[in-house]
Amino acid sequence: LILRRQSLMSDTLSHVSLAGVAVGIFLGQSTTWMTLVVVVIAALVLEYLRVSYKHYMEISTAILMSMGLAVALILSNKAGSSSMSLDSYLFGSIITISSEQVRALFVIAAIVLVLTLLFIRPMYLLTFDEDTAHVDGLPVRLMSLLFNIVTGIAIALMIPAAGSLLVSTIMILPAAIGMKIGQTFKSVIFWAIGIGLVGMLSGIFISYYWETPASATITLIFIAFFGLVSIFEPLLKAE
């Protein structure tokens, strides 16, 4: 997301996911499945807008983000007392997620890992130069769509645990830290994965004993990591 200059896409899809939650609550349906449906549709629309406004990509994110918030607010207002359920998705709670959601997270994590290992070179080309990827015979539009959809599904499944307000931070910061440490594309990926695991596990551990919100604790840990790496970055680059 960062290398493709689409960091705000995670924010956008998290807000759209909140709209999916509101739709589920309003219709009395499963919020998980409604969120996934809404996110997939949003991912398709986001790719269309990204291509339409190629030189102004922030326009597409602003349009969908505003729409997601507007739909979520209106439907939560119409849902009446059920709006309290929507509030829990704003900040999330790792202790309230269902076993079904945990299994879904493991499945999407496995899918992302397999896709990364199988298509790391095509993703490298797609990330840095779409024109070269197109000349190389890669299905650029399809790959971009799948990238958006997988990202959206991951965000939708993370929201019950991390909350829509902080899920984008949890997704972006490990990669941003990895970019400061890693020297190659692959090393950045592995550093981001390692930092993400350490930050998530330590955040859950600390939040349990300090009785603080897990998502906020994890976010602050990642920010602390980012600050430390930024301070010592000259030494890391020198090595």
Model-inferred region functions:
Residues 167-216:
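Transmembrane alpha-helical segments in multi-pass inner-membrane proteins
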Residues 212-239:
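Cytosolic-side transmembrane-helix boundaries in multi-pass membrane proteins
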Residues 26-41, 106-110, 156-170, 216-217:
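Structural signature of hydrophobic alpha-helical transmembrane segments
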Residues 53, 57, 61-122:
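Transmembrane helix-bundle core of multi-pass membrane transporters
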Residues 1-82, 178-190, 207-210, 233-235:
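Short loop segments and helix-boundary regions at transmembrane helix junctions
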Residues 114-147:
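Membrane-helix/interface signature in polytopic inner-membrane proteins
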Residues 32-37, 60-63, 102-107, 142-149, ...:
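Hydrophobic alpha-helical transmembrane segments
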Residues 15-28, 64-76, 96, 140-151, ...:
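Small-residue-rich segments of transmembrane alpha-helices in multi-pass membrane proteins
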